[in-house]
Design a protein with these regions (language model features):
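Conserved pre-ATP/AMP-binding loop-to-beta segment of ANL
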Residues: 2-17, 47-53
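Conserved adenylation A10 loop of the ANL superfamily
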Residues: 12-28
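Conserved G/P- and acidic residue-centered "switch" motifs that form tight phosphate/ATP-binding loops
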Residues: 21, 77, 153
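Active-site proximal helix/loop that lines the substrate pocket
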Residues: 23, 62, 156-159
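AMP-binding/adenylate-forming
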Residues: 26-45, 49, 53-112, 125, ...
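Gly/Ser/Thr-rich phosphate-binding loop
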Residues: 99-102, 111-173
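Short Gly/Pro-enriched turn/cap motifs at secondary-structure boundaries
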Residues: 174-180
């Protein structure tokens, strides 16, 4: 998607499909006002800055591709790189970036690569959602050094409406003990 496309989305809004986690995928219109408010929350909750480098591997018609980090980063003037997801390439390229959003299936695919064993995700912000994020995924990414935010509801509500940030194994265990 060219930058002109982002400007049109910011000015006019856009419609995207929900992931279908709560039933059939729904086409939901995102008004310019909703996008602006959602971008502000995404910027704040994920600590996006003008110096952020976003690696987008979700499709642009998916909230994870457009709303999680890409549109907020565009608003800031941050660097954005968009490409089709390939788990081997993601492992090879992620350390060039500060932020990436994965859906759980992508996270699982990344974890199955040979490069995962030696991957260091220190100082990388991973947002993951669109479907249930299993504890073992959160734990695996945090053990690699990532700050990991699990989120849901970004199409219907906002990009970071329901989220929890994990930056240590202790925090994972503390949170799990409260809900289990």
């Amino acid at each position: 998607m060219e930058y002109l496309g982002y400007e049109a989305i910011i000015a006019n809004g856009t419609s995207i499909y929900s992931s279908g986690t709560t039933g059939e995928p729904k086409l939901i219109h995102q008004t310019p006002e909703k996008l602006k408010a959602a971008d502000e929350v995404a910027i704040d909750s994920q600590k996006l800055t003008t110096k952020s480098k976003v690696y987008t591997v979700c499709k642009m018609n998916h909230a994870g591709g457009l709303l999680a980090q890409t549109l907020p980063a565009f608003r800031l003037g941050a660097e954005i790189h968009i490409e089709q997801f390939n788990p081997y390439r993601w492992v090879k390229e992620i350390n060039k970036y500060t932020h990436s959003h994965l859906i759980p299936a992508q996270a699982k695919a990344v974890m199955k690569t040979k490069g995962w064993r030696t991957l260091d995700l220190t100082n990388i912000w991973i947002t993951c959602g669109s479907d249930k994020v299993d504890w073992y995924i959160i734990n695996a990414f945090v053990k690699k050094g990532a700050t990991f935010m699990a989120n849901w509801g970004m199409t219907e509500i906002g990009p970071c409406a329901i989220n929890t940030v994990f930056d240590s194994v202790d925090k994972i265990e503390e949170y799990r003990s409260k809900i289990i």
